[in-house]
Amino acid sequence: MAEVLFFVPAAVVLCFLLQRRCRRSMEMPQYNYFRDLLLVAAWVLAALWAGSSVSRFIVGMAAFASLIGTCQHIRPHWGWKTVYLFVGLLFAFFGPKIGFIGLPDGQYHYFSPEVSIIATALWVGVFPVLLQQLDNIPGMAGHLLAVSFSLLLLATVFSGQDLPDAFFMSLCGLAFLGVFWSRHGHMYRRMGESLSAFWGVLVAGTSVLGVSKGITFSTL
């Protein structure tokens, strides 16, 4: 916990200063590309420095999804969207899984291993495509991500459970969205396929860790 509370503010300050410095010497397309790389690098370093193996896996899968988004941008084709289901399958086989869903009156329905893999693969595979669709309206995806990570963080803090991975991912998500807000929440600029896919896996993976899948689904 101490590492998280030290590294995240330090990373936010460093990212802010680097953006201010590079903005003066770069053209806008170069500057936006630099900020995208800086965002991914900040997530990777945060996971390596202060995250657990689960957090590192989620960030790694998000980076992989962003590469698919880059290919999707370079060679547009509807078939790229089906590749995110492959990302979801990899996530389901090697990462955290959706083991149950909450029901009314505090009851839970637990999945069999096979159903758990299918549910997780669909959950993680759909979110990158969903955010890309939301990103067709400039600023929409960024604002909904901010709402989602805020609710994820609140749900984690007040759940009464020990959920360090969910807390770490939610805090990083909110902090990095804030410091790169002009890239995500700009009302006349889209995030793009790569960044949308990156955040889609992050928010889907974070919601799998805690008690907040229903919150994430309802928000988005």
Regions found by a protein language model. Name each.
Residues 26-31, 74-77:
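Aspartate-rich (DDxxD/NDxxD/DxxxD) Mg2+/diphosphate-binding motifs
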Residues 45-55, 71-77, 92-108:
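Transmembrane alpha-helix boundary signature
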Residues 54-89:
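Hydrophobic alpha-helical hairpins/lids featuring a short glycine-rich hinge
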Residues 63-67, 87-98, 119-129, 145-151:
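Membrane-embedded alpha-helical core segments of multi-pass
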Residues 71-72, 127-135, 180-189:
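Transmembrane alpha-helix interface/packing and boundary motifs in multi-pass membrane proteins
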Residues 74-76, 126-148, 197:
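Short acidic, Gly/Ser-rich segments with clustered Asp/Glu that frequently serve as metal-coordination loops
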Residues 106-118:
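Short aromatic-rich membrane-water interface segments that cap or initiate transmembrane helices
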